[in-house]
Each structure stands twice: as C-alpha cells, then as structure tokens.
A protein has these predicted regions:
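Structural motif
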Residues: 89-91, 129-130, 219-221, 254-256, ...
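Active-site glycine-centered loops adjacent to acidic/histidine catalytic or metal-binding residues
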Residues: 94, 132-133, 164-165, 222, ...
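Extended active-site neighborhood of metal-dependent phosphoesterases/phosphodiesterases
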Residues: 29-77, 142-252, 267-291, 299-357, ...
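A short acidic, helix-capping loop that chelates divalent metal ions and anchors anionic groups
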Residues: 263-265
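Acidic, histidine-bearing metal-coordination/catalytic regions of metal-dependent phosphoesterases
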Residues: 1-127, 145, 149-161, 175-179, ...
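Short active-site segment of divalent metal-dependent hydrolases/proteases
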Residues: 97, 135-136, 261, 299
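Acidic-and-aromatic substrate-binding clefts and catalytic sites of carbohydrate-active enzymes
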Residues: 98-102, 136-141, 229-232
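Active-site proximal loops enriched in glycine and acidic residues that flank catalytic Cys/His/Asp
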Residues: 257-259, 296, 317-319, 377-379
C-alpha cells in the first residue's frame, strides 16, 4: 500500500491519478468558507521547452461546444442574475504559482475579499474566468492541487478557463492538455483525485475551445495552442466563424484567448498571427467581437483599437494572476510610458494603451448590464508590502457595448451653493 506523503496524497512517487473519486452525479461543487490560511507551495525548476504546435484533443462534449451557465449554478442563482439584469465576474490569467506560490495566494485572497457579505448575487462575482496558463510549466496533473485546487479552495463560485501555452506544452509520455481536460473538460462534475482535500469538482466545459452562455453576455473561448504568438487552424477557425455569425446580438460577444493580439510589453509583445485569424474570420462573417480578453503577458494592459467608423474595441491583457515573474513594459526614449500612448504593431496598425500595471499582481472585476461593460482592475500587495494594504483600484472604465464606445470618466457636476439645502434635526431648511 502506498505510503501517504501529505494530506490527501496517498500514491507512489511519480504515479499519476487516472480515476475520479466518488461524487454525487451531476452536482457541481465549488469553494467553501475559509477556516484558516492555506498551506505552502513547493519550489520547482523550469524544464526545457518544446513549443511546437500540439494537435487538439477530442472534444468531451457535442458541437457547437456550448456550456450554459444555468447548468452549472443553481436555478435560483441563475434567476437572480436574470431578474437583476446584471452579471458580475472575475477575470485573470497566468495564475499558476510555481516557484513561489505566495503571489498567487495573495491574488486569490484579493479575489476572495472582493465578495461582499450579504450582497445580492448580481453584485458579487458569479464566476472566475481564467485566460490560460492555469498550471506551470507543462500542465501536469500532479501540479493541479498546489497550483489550482489549493489556492482557490475558498473561491466560492465556479471557475472556467481557456488553455494557455503552458497548459498544452506537455512533457514526453503525457498527452497534450491532459490535466486541463481532466479538470476543466470533464463529462460530469466529479471530484478528481488531484483535488485531494479541496471541495471543488471538475468543470464540464465541452471542449478546449468553447462558448460560455450567460443571460448577459456570451464568451467565445479559443485555444491559441503552444507556439510563440499562438496558432489557430481549422476546424477551430471555422467554428469561430459560426459562433460569431450565430450567437445572439442582444448581449455582448466577448472573445477570450491566451495569446494577446496587442501588447506593449518588452517580453512577449502582441501576435499579428492571432490578429490575422480573428480579423479574417470576423470580416468573412460580418461581425466583430465587442471586446477581447487575453493573458500570456504577465501584467495588466487596457488597449483600445479605434476603428475608422468611429467605434472602439477594447483589447485587455489580464496576465498578472499569480505567476511569480511579472513582465516589464516597453520604454520610450529610455523612460517609462505615461498613458495614453499610441503605438503600432508590426503591420503598422495603431492602437492606444490607455492604462497598465507592470509592478503588481492583480485581478479584474467586470460587470455587464443591458448597455454597459464596467471594468475595475485591482492590484494586490506584493510580498514585501503590508497585507493590510488590501486591494487597490488601478483602472476603471465604462464601455457602451451597443454604441461600441467608452463613456468618459467624469466626476458629478457640483451643485451650486445657491440651491444647496440643509437638514437640521430631520427637517428640511430653506435654500441657502
């Protein structure tokens, strides 16, 4: 019998789990109330890289690869979102806490702190959406506890994801995306052995590229594979065209992927390859996404593309989710950029960098209503800073997705003193 090496770890060294633990059929289970601080993380060395294109695994669900939020959360919770006409959720990427798990833990704590006790469901995040690189460096099954289940043990809502290059960069002897498929694309919400003492069950996404349907927005998730700059081929590109063409226009259409189309960082930069795929498909079917969310670059950037017809498209990079190494931004004449800054990609296409953060980890909170997409990006303390500092609001925007334009951030107009009124002992006084 295998000797136990830690809590929930009753297997031999190097032995990978292959079967799911018993679980009530068809019931999703998420995080729980936090009783105490999470444990420590091991230190790892970085393996050699093999960044060639990986063939996609077979889908675990049926076309068109849709997952409706109503099948994951309770009917009463779903109805609450419909009634409120408001959807709140978290977005983040590149979250795996290999080498130094404290950064990931601080982000996880920050997202937990963003939940408001006793607030209506629509005012609290309904889920977390991860933009890839859930587990470093090779998406191994054995890393899912320390880099996924344990850090988010007390995140009380569902977690969805698209794979990143590190999720698919499999080691010899392992199938590409094996860990991702087990833990995000299960055929039913089973408790996986790698979850160990976590409550969370595996998510039931139908494919590595898929669409999340919600009452307030649809999220088209792409898998941009392993190569630098990403690579999307048929049949995924054909599926993307069908989704853009067929999904409802009554709610915003948000595309998610790992490799960003635009980025002003000095490490990865953007991907003209992803740009060509997305734009060629969108032009062919006559519909462009209302917003694009990506990770891969380990910082935060809000970039805007100004279209010739006067509309705007936000391209947002949210990749400072917990991986220890943050990415610096490009400099102008040796100096740090001061947004807004307009720069061009390799094809000369100009975009504007509106806001960025490259020295802190953080997360994004988004709210969607019938007209607006409201974004708030929060940074969390670094390890050397007081944890009591808490979440710090770094960016705020309101985007009218129907008009496809930002609403300017303005302070309320001051009320002239001549019309101010005073209340004394509960009675309304005369005008001053």
């Amino acid at each position: 019998m295998a000797k136990k090496t830690g809590k929930g770890r009753g297997r031999k060294n190097g032995e990978r789990p292959v079967k799911a633990a018993p679980q009530d059929a068809g019931i999703h289970v998420f995080g729980r109330a936090r009783p105490s601080q999470a444990g420590a993380y091991p230190i790892h060395g970085e393996p050699e890289r093999d960044t060639k294109f990986r063939p996609l695994p077979s889908p675990t669900g049926a076309p068109p690869f849709h997952l409706d939020l109503r099948s994951v959360i309770s009917p009463s919770d779903y109805q609450a979102l419909v009634t409120a006409k408001k959807l709140t959720f978290h977005v983040n990427g590149d979250m795996g806490g290999i080498k130094n798990g404290m950064d990931q833990q601080l982000v996880a704590r920050g997202m937990e702190a963003d939940f408001k006790p006793k607030a209506p469901l629509s005012d609290n995040p309904a889920f977390l959406y991860i933009l890839g690189d859930c587990v470093y460096y090779n998406g191994e099954v054995k890393e899912y506890y320390s880099q996924f289940y344990e850090p988010y043990e007390f995140f009380p809502r569902p977690i969805f994801a698209v794979p990143g290059n590190h999720d698919g960069e499999s080691l010899p002897g392992e199938e590409p995306l094996e860990g991702f498929l087990r833990n995000f694309c299960a055929k039913s919400p089973l408790k996986m052995p790698e979850a160990q003492d976590s409550n969370r069950t595996a998510m039931t996404q139908p494919n590595v590229y898929w669409t999340l349907l919600t009452p307030l927005a649809n999220f088209v998730g792409l898998y941009s594979n392993v190569p630098a700059g990403g690579e999307i081929t048929a049949p995924q590109s054909e599926w993307l065209g069908k989704e853009l063409k067929s999904l409802s226009k009554d709610v915003p259409l948000i595309v998610t992927l790992h490799h960003p189309i635009y980025s002003a960082d000095d490490h990865h930069s953007g991907s003209t390859r992803m740009k060509k795929v997305l734009e060629s498909v969108a032009e062919k079917v006559g519909r462009h996404p209302d917003m694009l969310l990506a990770g891969h670059v380990h910082n935060y950037q809000r970039i805007t593309k100004h279209v010739k017809d006067g509309t705007q498209v936000p391209y947002i990079v949210v990749g400072a989710g917990g991986y220890y190494n943050l990415h610096h931004m490009m400099k102008v004449d040796g100096e740090n950029m001061i947004p807004p800054v307009t720069f061009k990609d390799k094809e000369g296409d100009p975009v504007t960098l509106d806001r960025f953060s490259a020295d802190h980890h953080g997360f994004m909170r988004m709210e969607i209503t019938g007209k607006l997409i409201v974004g708030r990006y929060y940074t969390v303390p670094r390890q050397h800073e007081p944890y009591t500092k808490g979440n710090q609001l770094l960016d705020y925007f309101e985007f009218d997705w129907r008009a496809k334009r930002y609403i300017p951030n303005t302070l309320p107009t001051p009320v002239p003193s001549a019309v101010l009124t005073a209340h004394v002992r509960g009675r309304k006084a005369k005008k001053l």
